[in-house]
């Protein structure tokens, strides 16, 4: 999204459930990041003063942060529904450009941080329609205007990740306390209801040399026992080979990180892509292997045939010499 002659990379940080990252931590990291850019002589491009239509909004990075929890929401229909609420900040919908069905997104530029975005399932459960931008929902006794309605991703990996998340939140009797229905709202507004740790931080930043962006994040971002993942090049050949090398170990997590649904979906897609790479390689090699086997068999057959011919020829020559010897000797 957007364009530039510079190299950029997208990197995500996933934080453990006992993490202490908050808005102050994000602001502090941004200051540290900008200082690191200066130290490495990385600057945002200056707009052309001679061009009145030049873009003056150029920046070196874009970031987003989020945290999630469960809450009850009520709307026009009687009763309430339990949803997964994601508190978002920064350019969240730049990283997650969900399709809008009505209205618009929420952002840090909003005058009031009290608007929400519903997904289609939540909108249907509460109002029976997705065209509900401008209406209101009630959360903890407070009303929130609806900024817009989005359509959640419908690919197989996301569906599986959402199902897994709902099952993981089931109570001991097996009843799901979580729902695949979702609502998005300002992180500040959601955090004001109950202290909500930030569990995901995402950023696009310069990567002048391959690996620079991830290294900078690893060294400067207070990830603690969390995980840093570079999404750029994730599904490249080298990236999938790396997944194959860690196959099996990927499911063993001991760092206390609960990945958001989009990362679980990405990891699932990675595993499938790696499996397809293995199968594609095997099927690609199979004709060559079969041809090699056939050639080896033909070669061995010809060698054996030549050996038998040579052996018979030698025997015939020996017999011929014996016959000549007997004839010449009068035997």
Describe the function of each predicted region.
Residues 8-17, 63, 198-208:
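Short, hydrophobic/proline-enriched secondary-structure or compact coil segments at domain edges
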Residues 21-48, 181-183, 210-223:
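Well-ordered, non-membrane alpha-helical segments in soluble/globular domains
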Residues 266-288:
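N-terminal membrane-entry
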Residues 12, 27-102:
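Short amphipathic beta-strand/extended segments in non-transmembrane regions
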Residues 83, 88, 112-113, 117-118:
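A conserved catalytic-core signature of glycosyltransferases
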Residues 90-101, 118-216, 220-267:
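Mid-to-C-terminal secondary-structure elements
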Residues 285-330:
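Juxtamembrane interface at the cytosolic side of transmembrane helices
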Residues 2-28:
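Membrane-interface junction motifs in transport/secretion proteins
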């Amino acid at each position: 999204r957007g364009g530039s002659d510079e190299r950029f990379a997208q990197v995500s940080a996933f934080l453990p459930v006992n993490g202490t990252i908050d808005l102050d931590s994000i602001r502090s990291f941004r200051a540290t990041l900008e200082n690191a850019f200066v130290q490495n002589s990385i600057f945002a491009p200056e707009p052309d003063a001679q061009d009145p239509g030049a873009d003056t909004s150029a920046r070196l990075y874009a970031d987003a942060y989020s945290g999630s929890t469960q809450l009850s929401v009520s709307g026009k229909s009687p009763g309430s529904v339990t949803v997964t609420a994601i508190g978002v900040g920064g350019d969240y919908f730049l990283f997650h450009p969900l399709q809008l069905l009505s209205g618009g997104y929420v952002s840090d530029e909003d005058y009031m941080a009290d608007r929400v975005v519903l997904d289609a399932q939540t909108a249907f459960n509460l109002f029976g329609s997705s065209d509900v931008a401008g209406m209101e929902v009630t959360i903890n006794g407070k009303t929130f205007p609806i900024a817009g309605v989005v359509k959640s991703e419908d690919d197989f990996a996301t569906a599986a990740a959402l199902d897994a998340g709902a099952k993981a939140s089931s109570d001991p009797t097996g009843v799901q306390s979580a729902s695949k229905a979702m609502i998005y709202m300002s992180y500040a507004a959601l955090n004001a209801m109950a202290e909500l740790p930030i569990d995901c931080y995402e950023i696009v930043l310069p990567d002048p040399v391959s690996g620079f962006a991830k290294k900078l994040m690893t060294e400067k971002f207070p990830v603690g026992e969390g995980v840093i993942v570079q999404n750029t090049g994730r599904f490249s050949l080298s990236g999938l080979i790396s997944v194959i090398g860690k196959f099996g170990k990927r499911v063993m997590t001991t760092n206390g990180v609960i990945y958001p649904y989009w990362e679980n979906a990405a990891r699932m897609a990675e595993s499938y892509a790696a499996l397809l790479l293995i199968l594609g390689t095997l099927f690609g090699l199979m004709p060559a292997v079969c041809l090699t086997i056939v050639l080896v068999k033909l070669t061995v057959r010809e060698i054996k045939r030549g050996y038998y011919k040579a052996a018979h020829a030698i025997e015939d020559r020996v017999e011929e010499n014996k016959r000549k010897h007997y004839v010449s000797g009068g035997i």
